[in-house]
Regions:
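Bacterial N-terminal signal peptides that target proteins for export
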Residues: 1-12
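Bacterial N-terminal signal peptides
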Residues: 10-21
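C-terminal and inter-domain tail/linker signature
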Residues: 23-309
Length: 309
């Protein structure tokens, strides 16, 4: 009898151990960091970035890191030159464990626009993707104009204004299709749509391009962009109507491609005369199925360059 009781107790103990172990594995595999948690990880990253010291970052052994499309080692690149972050605009997506920030960084005496994307798996950073748009390498760069995040991106939409994740991505992709095909007819632009590139408003702005989002497409302003590739839509936020992606524009630099550009070809900066590509990170605000605002950080790269991903 005593032996039977001992056997029963052993069986129960073993069963409980197995249940706890299995539950532990199951629970750990379902850990999902909240938006607040992901932004905290980004803040920790940026804090160490300006200290030029990656020690203390919770990174995975197989971490992948790129800067402006090129693979780099942890602690190199912007990690060696960043001194201060003067502007931050976040977006997080707990469903994919990713967070990004558009920001302005001070390097020595110069300011630069930048984007950092982190992917976090449980408690480890597995991906770090950075784009740094310094003034001598970028178009429309005016980091000094960015002081506070635009409130439009933080606004939570009503249920009737929202679109599902797949629709948000489809709408954002239609924007790139419209550029390739030189038409705004396929792109659902909001009548009040505006675009900001490296801190500069590039729509409805007489000092850059005076026409609006749809008008620029219909006027074939971007006919010098012949291909948009490596399209990756990485984060989405249905509540706020946000979608974020990274793409590459190809620009062969041929004179005939600038026929409809508002500035005469011979008056354009010399960078327009040569083949180049553009690595872009873009965030879209989509309300009622229409693109209301676009925010981008972009940098010139060699023609045909990849994003590194």
């Amino acid at each position: 009898m005593k032996k039977n009781i001992i056997n029963v107790l052993v069986f129960i103990s073993f069963s409980l151990f197995c249940c706890v172990s299995i539950c532990g594995v199951a629970c750990s595999s379902k850990i999902e960091l909240s938006s607040k948690d992901l932004i905290s990880v980004m803040d920790r990253y940026l804090d160490l970035l300006v200290k030029n010291d990656p020690v203390g970052l919770p990174v995975a052994n197989n971490i992948k890191i790129t800067e402006n499309g090129y693979p780099i080692q942890l602690g190199s690149g912007l990690f060696q030159t960043a001194e201060e972050i003067t502007y931050k605009q976040y977006m997080a997506d707990p469903s994919v464990g990713q967070v990004m920030v558009f920001g302005v960084v001070k390097e020595s005496v110069l300011l630069a626009n930048f984007m950092v994307r982190l992917k976090v798996d449980k408690d480890k950073i597995t991906e770090i993707e950075t784009i740094v748009a310094r003034k001598d390498e970028s178009s429309f760069a005016s980091p000094e104009d960015l002081k506070e995040p635009r409130p439009i991106y933080a606004r939570v939409l009503s249920e009737s204004e929202r679109s599902p994740r797949d629709v948000l991505i489809k709408i954002a992709n239609s924007y790139f299709e419209g550029i390739e095909q030189n038409t705004g007819e396929m792109v659902p632009f909001h009548k009040d749509c505006n675009r900001y590139e490296n801190g500069t408003q590039t729509t409805n702005n007489p000092s850059t391009i005076a026409t609006g989002c749809k008008e620029q497409f219909d006027d074939k302003v971007y006919s010098y962009i012949t291909k948009i590739r490596n399209r990756r839509f990485l984060l989405a936020d249905e509540e706020k109507g946000l979608v974020f992606g990274i793409v590459t524009f190809d620009m062969p630099g041929k004179r005939e491609n600038f026929e409809y550009f508002p500035t005469p070809f011979d008056e354009l900066p010399t960078r327009f005369y040569k083949p180049r590509s553009l690595l872009l990170a873009e965030m879209f605000k989509i309300v009622d199925g229409q693109i209301l605002s676009i925010e981008a950080v972009m940098v010139n790269v060699p023609f045909g360059a990849t994003s590194g991903w």
